[in-house]
């Protein structure tokens, strides 16, 4: 422990002297109030400290005390359903302890509840050899999540004691005799520094799709479990709703939602909606699998920088248990702005648009902690982290540094489009500019699993949309009637794909989520109509006759998005109905 004195205060940056024994990334207690800060730069005996609380009223001469430890999170039972701030202070218990709706400065509250007792069930017995990552036992944390208590990193040896029963997170639950003869006494809780990724046995190639229930994503721009995706878009384009939808319905075990520098009412929406929503996979409340980290725009700027790392470290902990985890960061642009502010106060040479020169490497550090891995331990386990980051470029300009550095790393780009949002087409993901580099892997995975030609259907549907885009300019110049019959059919089918398939209402109880079998049935109906109508045109039928003769069945195709999942056969039955009606048009003499 080293004690120094403050010499300057500049917003969230405090410079202290007499800190020659301190290290970079040490946590400090700053001033008489004991504010939490982290050393980010050392020059001789002077330490530059990033303070995670409001610094008004702090002045030169006040003491700074280092703890000798890096910024770390507590990992153990009690994380799920909890809401933390950027440095893992539990907001619910913080409010009760301080009796205030605001963050009172200098208050230290343990991240995990020290009084709560958890029922521990051992999975191993005394005398067994264990290595780091082995599961010693389990705690039923919520109705959905079984918390697996693991041997901490760098601990291995013989299990000499393990106890069943109800324990707090600090009680000794097991003892391991290590190779050097020392006894390691372990509890249900462990700590981990947030800026250091948790080690794994092996990184694997992600192939299994993350099913979100959003048709435009799952069909055209899928992300895998263990992949990384970015959602850039201008104000009002629907970034937050896309993030909320994925958090609600993604087929993962655990969701970490990081509200980083965005409006507080967005976190309020999460708190109001999530407890009422039922997870379609488990039948339990979605809150039973969710961890919330709130660092909203009215909270200290410096803590935004920590909140992203706090979230990804908690995600890695659950991944190591063998779970699939999705982490949403809304928004990484606000996090980058916090980096820019600290860089400016440190008087570093600025890069593009004032962001620090190391912006790209910091963004990469975050996204590269996602992935599909084989975890440590003698038991074979796989875990995944899917990282989805919203980016808020000013004015929707994706050429700015945060978006460009993000796109260098992630493999999925869901580009939100202001014109689509203004036309009330949601999700406003532009199908012409967005992309997914997982498309081929996911397509072949689904073809193999479902025994279907899904990837072929997706390619055909995208070709229709691209053909429509090339025809639109001709239509604007000389009108729709000047097109050939086949091209008019392309325009009609593309409109069906856009309005009846891609457009989705997040606030409709049925349309908000579409399972994969329903997506396939809906897309098959539209493509069948295109195929049969194209054949009819080649046999001499007229476009207008086909459209009039199939008006009823096309209306039913359009309404199929509102048919509940349990009535899936109704949607599948429309395929034959389409063929029958077009054949009827031909039989009537449309030649």
From Swiss-Prot:
The lineage of its organism: Bacteria, Bacillati, Bacillota, Bacilli, Lactobacillales. It comes from the Bacteria. Belongs to the ATPase alpha/beta chains family. It catalyses: ATP + H2O + 4 H(+)(in) = ADP + phosphate + 5 H(+)(out). It is an enzyme of class 7 (translocase). ATP binds at residues 233-240. GO terms for biological process: proton motive force-driven plasma membrane ATP synthesis. Keywords: ATP synthesis, ATP-binding, Hydrogen ion transport, Ion transport, Nucleotide-binding, Translocase, Transport. Produces ATP from ADP in the presence of a proton gradient across the membrane. The V-type alpha chain is a catalytic subunit. GO terms for molecular function: ATP binding; proton-transporting ATP synthase activity, rotational mechanism; proton-transporting ATPase activity, rotational mechanism. This is V-type ATP synthase alpha chain. The keyword Transport applies. Its EC number is 7.1.2.2. The gene is atpA. HAMAP family: ATP_synth_A_arch. InterPro entries: ATP-synt_VA_C (IPR055190), ATP-synth_a_Xtn (IPR031686), ATP_synth_asu-like_sf (IPR023366), ATPase_a/bsu_AS (IPR020003), ATPase_F1/V1/A1_a/bsu_N (IPR004100), ATPase_F1/V1/A1_a/bsu_N_sf (IPR036121), ATPase_F1/V1/A1_a/bsu_nucl-bd (IPR000194), ATPase_F1/V1_b/a_C (IPR024034). Pfam families: ATP-synt_ab (PF00006), ATP-synt_ab_N (PF02874), ATP-synt_ab_Xtn (PF16886), ATP-synt_VA_C (PF22919). One of its GO terms (cellular component) is proton-transporting ATP synthase complex. The keyword Transport applies.
